[in-house]
């Protein structure tokens, strides 16, 4: 592993449709635009950023497993898996990599089934309702915490 810190950005189901899917809830910015902006931000902060978006739970879990020993921090928007995936929770626990949970919308102001997260209690923190800015805040926080621990 290089000396450069590595942050992994994970995005769950339907986030590939950002920019066109329910823009009143999720905004008009595409996932590609978000990732491009975060990649520039990561570079300016002196860290490496890698990204995976998948609609398949197993692909996200496999990537989390591969992160062990190679990734210093995870920023994850698990999308609908937030409310359903014990397997995603177990994968994050298994690798012991700190992570921040991000949601574009305020999940607590939405349908009751969205109020529960299987990840929040094991995360470093949760950012929700700040739109695409939440990703930037999560990346900045991850880098700050990594800098303090190294």
From Swiss-Prot:
Active site feature: 26, 103
Key words of the record: Amino-acid biosynthesis, Aromatic amino acid biosynthesis, Lyase
Reaction equations catalysed: 3-dehydroquinate = 3-dehydroshikimate + H2O
Residues involved in substrate binding: 77, 83, 90, 104-105, 114
Pfam families: DHquinase_II
Gene3D superfamilies reported for this sequence: Dehydroquinase, class II
Class of this enzyme: lyase
Description of how the protein assembles with itself and partners: Homododecamer.
Official protein name in the record: 3-dehydroquinate dehydratase
Organism, as annotated: Erwinia tasmaniensis (strain DSM 17950 / CFBP 7177 / CIP 109463 / NCPPB 4357 / Et1/99)
């Amino acid at each position: 592993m290089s000396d450069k810190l590595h942050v992994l950005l994970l995005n769950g189901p339907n986030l590939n449709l950002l920019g066109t899917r329910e823009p009143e809830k999720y905004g008009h910015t595409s996932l590609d635009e978000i990732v491009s902006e975060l990649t520039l931000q990561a570079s300016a902060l002196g860290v490496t950023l890698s990204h995976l978006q998948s609609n398949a739970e197993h692909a996200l879990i496999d990537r989390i497993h591969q992160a062990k020993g190679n990734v210093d921090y995870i920023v994850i928007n698990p999308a609908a898996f937030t409310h359903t995936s014990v397997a995603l929770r177990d994968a994050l626990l298994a690798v012991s990599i700190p992570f921040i949970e991000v949601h574009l919308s305020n999940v607590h102001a939405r349908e009751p089934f969205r109020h529960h997260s299987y990840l929040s209690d094991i995360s470093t923190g949760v950012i929700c309702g700040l739109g695409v800015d939440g990703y930037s805040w999560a990346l900045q926080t991850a880098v700050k915490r990594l800098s303090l621990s190294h």
